A protein has these predicted regions:
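Amphipathic alpha-helical scaffolding segments comprising HEAT/armadillo-like alpha-solenoid repeats
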Residues: 6-10, 56-63, 71-81, 105-116, ...
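Non-catalytic protein-protein interaction scaffold segments in large eukaryotic complex-forming proteins
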Residues: 1-66
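Structural detector for internal amphipathic alpha-helices that build alpha-solenoid repeat scaffolds
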Residues: 1, 11, 29, 44-47, ...
């Protein structure tokens, strides 16, 4: 019920970020992007939208809101002078991520990769470990590979798990080699483990480059 009402409200008020701030907490509020518990199966489209087209339209609404606000907006006073409302880009991207999760649309997931750096790190780690596991395009592969060097340990760990199940190209392994210059010991160990999966000739080339 909450989602249905908030969905209808977003149809009308998506051009008003201050109103979206009050809509968003109820919008798709039954979804949890968590690596733990029983949340990895993913939401069903039919539980939240009438059609795929409607879901994509709402994704575009959310993207418009994202582009119209700063990292965090504060609306105060809000309705009453003692109240305030907040809207962050991370909040918006999380709802966009839910839509890409339920649609299984590779092109939409490609599009979201440009916005994922704004997402709060715990949720970003969950998205990589659940929705981008495995990646379904080269762009998604590159995003996961880039995340192997993220500041967040959670994000790095999930990226490593995804990459461990992939066969990396020589070009991708070159990018993994670059991570060995960073000081984080866990990041370096992950990079070495990935490089050790290469065929013997490519591994020898990696060792030669790293020693020169």
């Amino acid at each position: 019920m909450n989602h249905r009402i908030s969905k209808e409200a977003l149809e009308v008020w998506h051009n008003e970020p201050s109103v979206v701030a009050s809509i968003l907490p109820l919008y798709m509020n039954g979804i949890h992007l968590s690596r733990y518990g029983n949340y990895q199966e993913g939401p069903q489209l039919i539980d939240y939208f009438e059609t795929k087209e409607e879901a994509v339209r709402h994704y575009e609404y959310l993207k418009q809101v994202y582009q119209s606000i700063s990292a965090k907006e504060t609306y105060s006073p809000y309705i009453f002078f003692w109240e305030s409302a907040f809207l962050t880009r991370s909040d918006i991207v999380l709802k966009m991520a839910y839509i890409t999760w339920m649609l299984h649309d590779s092109a939409l997931r490609d599009d979201l990769c440009a916005y994922l750096p704004t997402l709060e790190t715990y949720m970003r780690a969950g998205y990589i470990g659940i929705v981008l596991n495995p990646p379904t395009s080269q762009l998604q592969e590159e995003y996961v590979l880039q995340s192997l060097g993220d500041r967040s340990v959670d994000v790095r760990d999930e990226a490593y798990k995804v990459l461990s199940d992939m066969t990396l190209s020589p070009e991708q392994n070159l990018k993994v080699e670059e991570l060995l210059r960073f000081k984080y010991s866990e990041m370096r160990i992950n990079a070495i483990n990935l490089l050790m999966k290469q065929p013997k000739e490519q591994l020898a080339d990696s060792i030669r480059r790293l020693l020169t």
